[in-house]
Amino acid sequence: LSGEEQGLFGGKILAKYAQEHDWRVHGVLNNDMIGNSTGINGVTDNTTARIFSEGTRVIETKDQAHKRRFTGGEVDSASRNLARYIDTIADRYIENLDTMLVYRLDRFGRGGHHRPFNDVGFAAVRIMETNENYNQQHQDLRTENGITYGDTIDYVDFAYAAKLTSLNAVTMASMAWAPAPPTGVSISGAVKPSTTLAWHKSDDPTVVSYKIYWRYTSEPKWQFSRDVGK
């Protein structure tokens, strides 16, 4: 997407177009940046990556915020669950890669093209390298005081970039194989020792079963699951 550094123009245009044309978007994976493995701090690490995701949705209504106050879910936005899913895929399929869930929209004072999609209600995350080198970002090509500035191909760790590209490919393939998410989902449990989940059963013949995941509220990742059939 173009115009990122000038004001996220490409993302804004595409997100608006997708919204106006009723695109069915289940997730946006913004890869920015995935090719550098040596940070300005001198650390070289090609075994980790970060996944940034927003908490509460920016389009949340006052009524939704009121309900969330009593039911929780501050760390259960669609974007954050997408990040958890990508992390699970990394653990399952990508060797020697540990993805770290970062509970923020982006780095402090920074932005990326996933944000315009969040702004209109789509689940979107930022996948990026762990260690950044700011001498290679937003710089004119030059050498000053023995320091080389600028983003050039010499600094690309292609093996690392391939690893994160593979993560994207496997994630998208896994999501594409899945049927549509259930509709009419509700949760209840007042004056009960347990929680009741309900949803509209799908008529899709490819749906053979539903699996429920849960975790302690203090845990970042899903801990438990149960297959409940169809």
Model-derived regions: residue spans:
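Metal-dependent peptidase/peptidase-like ectodomains
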Residues: 3-111
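Extracellular/periplasmic catalytic domains that process cell-envelope and extracellular macromolecules
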Residues: 7, 20-24, 117-121, 204-206
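Active-site-adjacent mobile loop/cap segments within catalytic or ligand-binding domains
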Residues: 36-52, 101-177
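Active-site proximal loops enriched in glycine and acidic residues that flank catalytic Cys/His/Asp
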Residues: 128-131, 201, 216
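Proline-enriched interdomain boundary motifs that mark the N-terminal boundary
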Residues: 177-188
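An aromatic-rich alpha-helical recognition segment common to small helix-rich domains
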Residues: 182, 197-201, 212-214, 230
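Conserved aromatic anchor
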Residues: 193-207
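Recognizes extended acidic, P/S/T-rich segments that occur
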Residues: 209-230
